[in-house]
């Protein structure tokens, strides 16, 4: 089953009939418009490309304008592709609404996490701090050794060090679908999702459901 592109609206809470409070993230999923259908014969795999939302004409470059015009679809703010399962069929120009999640129990949500700038190893990787005293006067939050000796004589790739924190693609898996509001194009999922308010999200049925 395909996924859809949505936008993070924010967080709130709803109550069950028993009075239990559930923290939910509200995701606005406007109709996704199919801009391209990829077929096994031409492309080597089956997929659809979708767009959603709208974009000022002045913000659409010429290649994008031609692509949207060929599909006969209004220019959207983002283009994303989803693989098709066996038996799934879609046509260019078709609209797909949030209702496809009506029978889905859990979803995976992908977004871009909030950027936190340059961060040290304590904040970025949860390194422990060194002694506050006992002879330590300068190295309370430093990472310590980053290597070994003449052998191997280098710092290994992937070494946890200070650097950019956040602003990367993150997927949160198996979030419960609490409510699907087709009238207002809203999907309510239990818990938090990556990114700030207004950020683009990709919502797919959970892989591990």
Swiss-Prot record:
Q: Where is this region: Disordered?
A: 132-153
Q: Which GO terms describe its cellular component?
A: cytosolic large ribosomal subunit
Q: Which GO terms describe its molecular function?
A: rRNA binding; structural constituent of ribosome
Q: How is it modified after translation?
A: Methylated by PrmB.
Q: Give the record's keywords alphabetically.
A: Methylation, Ribonucleoprotein, Ribosomal protein, RNA-binding, rRNA-binding
- Please give a single GO biological process term from the UniProt record: translation
User: Which Pfam family, any one, appears in the UniProt record?
Assistant: Ribosomal_L3
According to the record, the segments passing through the membrane are: none
Q: Where in this protein does the record say N5-methylglutamine is found?
A: 150
Superkingdom as given in the UniProt entry:
Bacteria
Indicate the quaternary assembly: Part of the 50S ribosomal subunit. Forms a cluster with proteins L14 and L19.
User: What family does this chain come from, according to its entry?
Assistant: Belongs to the universal ribosomal protein uL3 family.
Q: What does this protein do?
A: One of the primary rRNA binding proteins, it binds directly near the 3'-end of the 23S rRNA, where it nucleates assembly of the 50S subunit.
Stated name of the protein? Large ribosomal subunit protein uL3
Q: Which organism is it from?
A: Photorhabdus laumondii subsp. laumondii (strain DSM 15139 / CIP 105565 / TT01) (Photorhabdus luminescens subsp. laumondii)
